[in-house]
């Protein structure tokens, strides 16, 4: 089994009597990830092995995703799943378009200016709205907030874990 797992949601409660669970999604690809027939893995805190489940139904309800699993068709069978984290193995992530990246590929990358000056390392990605914002940790200075927009991010090399940016005036506090 895989060594790398990626969080795609968390079961926060049950819903109704038909074995549905309420999920807070942690993926940008919920429709794809929770599609009936897909395999997901449920991780309980402290458990040695995940529980492998197959999605049998998926629907939206308010701000939650409601999932049913083929292996657990009743409320009694899903009650113990509360607070479990839903993950997928790395090989199930799927391919992205040419200029799209998974967060785990960006986090940890070095950020340099167009002049080659080291700015810092991406430590977190925020998703406030129109575009993502990368939080860049800098040695001995405040974190820099870098918008993921074409006028700022000039090159991303995932293999070298290096990102080149155009430092606009006022973008980075000294």
Swiss-Prot record:
One of its GO terms (biological process) is rRNA processing. Belongs to the RimM family. Residues 98-171 form the PRC barrel domain. It comes from Bacillus velezensis (strain DSM 23117 / BGSC 10A6 / LMG 26770 / FZB42) (Bacillus amyloliquefaciens subsp. plantarum). The PRC barrel domain binds ribosomal protein uS19. One of its GO terms (molecular function) is ribosome binding. An accessory protein needed during the final step in the assembly of 30S ribosomal subunit, possibly for assembly of the head region. Essential for efficient processing of 16S rRNA. May be needed both before and after RbfA during the maturation of 16S rRNA. It has affinity for free ribosomal 30S subunits but not for 70S ribosomes. InterPro entries: PRC-brl_dom, PRC_barrel-like_sf, RimM, RimM_N, RimM_N_sf, Transl_B-barrel_sf. The keyword GTP-binding does not apply. It comes from the Bacteria. Keywords: Chaperone, Cytoplasm, Ribosome biogenesis, rRNA processing. This is Ribosome maturation factor RimM. One of its GO terms (cellular component) is ribosome. The keyword Transit peptide does not apply. Coiled coil: none annotated. SUPFAM superfamilies: PRC-barrel domain (SSF50346), Translation proteins (SSF50447). Binds ribosomal protein uS19. Its main location: cytoplasm. It is found in: Cytoplasm.
């Amino acid at each position: 089994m895989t060594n790398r797992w990626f969080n795609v949601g968390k079961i926060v409660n049950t819903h109704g009597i038909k074995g549905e669970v309420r999920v807070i999604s942690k993926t940008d690809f919920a429709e794809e990830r929770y599609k009936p027939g897909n395999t997901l893995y449920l991780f309980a805190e402290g458990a040695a092995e995940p529980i492998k489940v197959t999605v049998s139904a998926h629907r939206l309800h308010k701000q939650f995703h409601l999932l049913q699993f083929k292996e657990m068709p009743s409320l009694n069978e899903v009650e113990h799943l509360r607070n479990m984290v839903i993950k997928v193995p790395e090989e199930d992530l799927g391919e992205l378009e040419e200029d799209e990246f998974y967060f785990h590929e960006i986090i940890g990358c070095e950020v340099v200016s167009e002049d080659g000056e080291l700015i810092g390392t991406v430590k977190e990605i925020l998703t406030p709205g129109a575009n993502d914002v990368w939080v860049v940790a800098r040695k001995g200075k405040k974190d820099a907030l870098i918008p993921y927009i074409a006028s700022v991010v000039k090159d991303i090399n995932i293999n070298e874990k290096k990102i080149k940016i155009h430092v606009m005036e006022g973008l980075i506090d000294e």
